[in-house]
Amino acid sequence: MLRAVMDSSQTDVEKSARNRIAWRLLPFLFLLYVANYLDRTNIAYATLGMKGDLGLTDSVFGTASGIFFIGYLGLQIPGALLVEQWSARRLLALTLITWGALTTLTSFVHTPLQLYGARFLLGAAEAGFFPGVIVYLSHWFIYEDRAKAVARFMSAIPIGFILGGPIAGKILGLHWLGLFGWRWLFLFEGVPAVLLGIATLFVLPDRPNEVRWLRGDERDWLTCRLAEERRAIAHVEHVTIWQALRHPTVLLLTVGLFFTYTGGYAFWFWMPTMLQRLTGWTDIQRIGWIGSIPFIAGLIGMLLLGWSSDRVRERRWHFAAPQLTAAVALTIWLLLSHSNGLLLTVFTLVGFGTVAYLPSFWALPSAFLTSSAAAAAVGFINCTASIGGFFGPKVIGDLSERSGSFNGGFAFMIVCLVIASVLVLICPRERVPGVSA
């Protein structure tokens, strides 16, 4: 009887701590990531006005979109390690303020070369944010909650696109003070990141032992549980930072994510232009609203698959299935006669497939690595795979400019998504007891 009462009390403490952590941290992190994706991807809509003003070709736009990821490469591993060994609060605040200022300054570019420079610097400024947050979540969420936490955080990606399209459509119609609407778009969307960066210094705690909103028993439970998980992983295999970067599973995940990013960012950056050309629509506000639909599907898929992945404790098929769905949808577009209705259906499925996999994938590294090794692996995977974010948009632009059609680009995306799925499916199983990869 006494043991039953103690078990019930322990369960209540665990449930209370898990709920309190989720409600305290995830809404603010979600807001930061919405700002991140608004600033990263607003060029997808800005180009509808920039092309005429700056004389951009498809190839130049593809390069400008993708060069962000060249700047993004260098600082991701240091960013993840600084969160592990220094301070998430300070690093994320610095990152937000810097990228917000650079987004605002992008409104003053006048040549393609200046646009390349602005996008490169923006990528460098944003580099530490995502891997830093992934490592930060592992300091607060136990393993069985981690994919759900990542899913809720990363739901900001489709939300950023869902909001970004209509907002951009409205702002692009402005012509205040003799400035084109695309310049106002960069001006307006950089300011929230700066303000949120300042707020981060006062809102975001670094570690559980720093907060007063957890009771003592909740804090003790969380600290012990996270320590047990780290010991369980370390007991199976002790991996140093340098060993982690050469770990076969890390390398497979890296190459798999490279192909995912190549296909995904190709679609994300080019989708508004594809909609405009393939439908013949000229109303930018209409394109903005319709362009949000694929990402609504992605948001729903992300939340459902993140929940399912934790429930059945499986990651690899939850990564592959949505991407194979997107590949099949694009194949159907290439094989069937075209209509606007079919295009919107295909784009909705591609939006689902290129977003829904995210939480399952980012729950994988912490399943077989711990502490600084996991932090380094997250940074290494994301920074190396991000090269795909350069190649994807650039290849689509080059193929479109040469052929006058997006069909070659669609075929390229199909190949990338299939290769990514196969590579992650052949990864070894995870090492956390009771979890299937």
Residue ranges and their predicted role:
Residues I43-A44, W242-L303, L358, W362, ...:
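Extracytoplasmic gate region of multi-pass secondary transporters
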Residues G55, S87, F108-Q114, A125, ...:
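Helix-breaking motifs and short loop linkers at transmembrane-helix boundaries and internal kinks
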Residues G74-L113:
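Conserved MFS/SLC helix-loop-helix module at the cytosolic interface between two early adjacent transmembrane helices
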Residues L75-S87, G301-E314, S400-E401:
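Helix-to-loop junctions at the C-terminal end of transmembrane segments
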Residues E84-L96, D310-Q323:
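Cytoplasmic membrane-interface "Motif A"-like loop-to-helix N-cap segments
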